[in-house]
């Protein structure tokens, strides 16, 4: 049985709660000693993992809608993407303010050079910023065919973000490997599209170099 528009509306409400409740828990944990011995790292990892969860959920929607024959599920994709961006922004903010400190934000440039995994994280965030800014129907109409080309960069984020996570942890544990494995699986479901995008990009680069 296919989902109705009303059911999708209620699903959106549930997804908004799924985005908000972790934030409420984090606030509670900060104020009631619910974090570990290194609360700054705990906050950074929690916000980063939550952003990754919403990224994976966003990537899951299209194949799920296709294979489950639930076309209206696509309506939840933008919502999940915006929550991914929100949590990624919290992740970046927690690093900038809690790790570096307000008075040391100028060090961010140096950190990006000395810690390459931060560069991957910043690139991912900038892409998510662009996708969030252009996620409205008005921007979709304005950009035309370029809109889809821009939003295909979410696949690059799906590659860079798990690498950023794996690279940032001192000891490799199962958790970042699971996130990376899920990202690979979700990308593999799109291998035909990704191969087509790669071949198109290679052709464009070849044509420019041949001029």
Curated annotation (Swiss-Prot):
Highest taxon above the source species: Bacteria
Pfam (any one): Ferric_reduct
Subcellular localization(s) per the UniProt record: Cell inner membrane
Keyword tags: Cell inner membrane, Cell membrane, Electron transport, Flavoprotein, FMN, Heme, Iron, Membrane, Metal-binding, Transmembrane, Transmembrane helix, Transport
Cellular compartments per GO CC: plasma membrane
Subunit structure: Heterodimer of a catalytic subunit (MsrP) and a heme-binding subunit (MsrQ).
Membrane-spanning segments: 10-30, 82-102, 116-136, 153-173, 178-198
Recorded topology in the membrane: Multi-pass membrane protein
Function summary: Part of the MsrPQ system that repairs oxidized periplasmic proteins containing methionine sulfoxide residues (Met-O), using respiratory chain electrons. Thus protects these proteins from oxidative-stress damage caused by reactive species of oxygen and chlorine generated by the host defense mechanisms. MsrPQ is essential for the maintenance of envelope integrity under bleach stress, rescuing a wide series of structurally unrelated periplasmic proteins from methionine oxidation, including the primary periplasmic chaperone SurA and the lipoprotein Pal.
UniProt xrefs under InterPro entries: Fe3_Rdtase_TM_dom, MsrQ-like
Protein name: Protein-methionine-sulfoxide reductase heme-binding subunit MsrQ
Predominant localisation class: membrane
Similarity comment: family membership: Belongs to the MsrQ family.
Cofactor note: Binds 1 FMN per subunit. Binds 1 heme b (iron(II)-protoporphyrin IX) group per subunit.
Cofactor(s) this protein requires: FMN; heme b
GO BP terms in the entry: protein repair
Any GO MF annotation of the entry: oxidoreductase activity, acting on diphenols and related substances as donors
Organism name: Escherichia coli (strain 55989 / EAEC)
Keyword flag Flavoprotein: yes
